[in-house]
């Protein structure tokens, strides 16, 4: 039996099985809004509509795609989530370009859900430790005098906020933001801001006095980080950063345990 004959034989023998499998697995039909979304996305990516240019009106899109208003609106909402259009009340959708913030925004819901699972906070804290460890080493090796001055200014605001918990949290976030800005990578910034937002939102409510003590410890650890960066010592900067974040993690874990016992 030749090769082609053998192939033909296998095809004939297996066709009833394939037919049964296909009948048991119906093809998924796309919604009209999904088809409109895909077509508009391709048009935007082909530069048929330039950045900042308005798309046709809803009525024109309805006529062009021969669909109803709900399908057009769903498609535009999906494109907005992707960062491909901006939608303002009373105006036609305008083409935009997705940013790092758009990417992080898409992940935000999943991240918050993950944080609510057992061990979720610990996993995100480990991610933050790995991420900021790289940032602080880079800062110690490459930070300019101007960037170190910005860190010092953030540290000064830190010190002025020790007795005001809300202000200290803002200055704490700002200190780490200045650190994340040093490489000049907008994706790093978006990841860093999102990580802190997610972690802070997951933290328990704590009495003011306990937070005052925590603020003072964090401030002293920030000083150690800046001193190491100023000396351009990446190993010492990394040790100071890891000591700081491990301390923060342990403190908030203890706060959480105390809060749970009171419930």
From Swiss-Prot:
Residues 30-98 form the HTH gntR-type domain. GO terms for biological process: negative regulation of DNA-templated transcription. InterPro entries: GntR_C (IPR011711), TF_FadR/GntR_C (IPR008920), Tscrpt_reg_HTH_GntR (IPR000524), Tscrpt_reg_NanR (IPR023730), WH-like_DNA-bd_sf (IPR036388), WH_DNA-bd_sf (IPR036390). One of its GO terms (molecular function) is DNA-binding transcription factor activity. Residues 58-77 bind DNA. SMART domains: FCD, HTH_GNTR. Pfam families: FCD, GntR. Keywords: DNA-binding, Repressor, Transcription, Transcription regulation. Residues 1-21 are annotated as: Disordered. Belongs to the NanR family. Transcriptional repressor that controls expression of the genes required for the catabolism of sialic acids. This is HTH-type transcriptional repressor NanR. It comes from Escherichia coli O7:K1 (strain IAI39 / ExPEC). The lineage of its organism: Bacteria, Pseudomonadati, Pseudomonadota, Gammaproteobacteria, Enterobacterales.
């Amino acid at each position: 039996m030749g090769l082609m004959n053998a192939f033909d034989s296998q095809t004939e023998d297996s066709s009833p099985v394939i037919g049964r499998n296909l009948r048991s697995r119906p093809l998924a039909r796309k919604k009209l809004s999904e088809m409109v979304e895909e077509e508009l996305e391709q048009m935007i990516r082909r530069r048929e509509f330039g950045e900042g240019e308005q798309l046709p009106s809803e009525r024109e899109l309805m006529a062009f795609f021969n669909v109803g208003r709900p399908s057009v609106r769903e498609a535009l909402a999906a494109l907005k989530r992707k960062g491909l259009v901006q939608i303002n009340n009373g105006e036609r959708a305008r083409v935009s370009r997705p940013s790092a913030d758009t990417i992080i925004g898409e992940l935000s819901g999943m991240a918050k859900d993950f944080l609510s699972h057992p061990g979720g906070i610990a996993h995100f804290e480990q991610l933050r430790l790995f991420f900021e460890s790289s940032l602080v080493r880079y800062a110690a090796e490459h930070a300019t005098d101007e960037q170190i001055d910005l860190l010092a200014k953030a540290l000064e605001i830190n010190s002025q906020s020790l007795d005001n918990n809300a202000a200290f949290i803002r200055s704490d976030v700002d200190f780490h933001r200045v650190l994340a800005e040093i490489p000049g990578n907008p994706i790093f910034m978006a990841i860093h801001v999102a990580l802190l937002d997610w972690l802070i939102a997951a933290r328990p409510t704590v009495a003011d006095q306990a937070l005052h003590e925590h603020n003072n410890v964090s401030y002293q650890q920030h000083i150690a980080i800046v001193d190491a960066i100023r000396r351009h010592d990446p190993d010492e900067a990394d040790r100071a950063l890891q000591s700081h974040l491990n301390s923060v993690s342990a403190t908030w874990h203890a706060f959480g345990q105390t809060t749970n016992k009171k419930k």
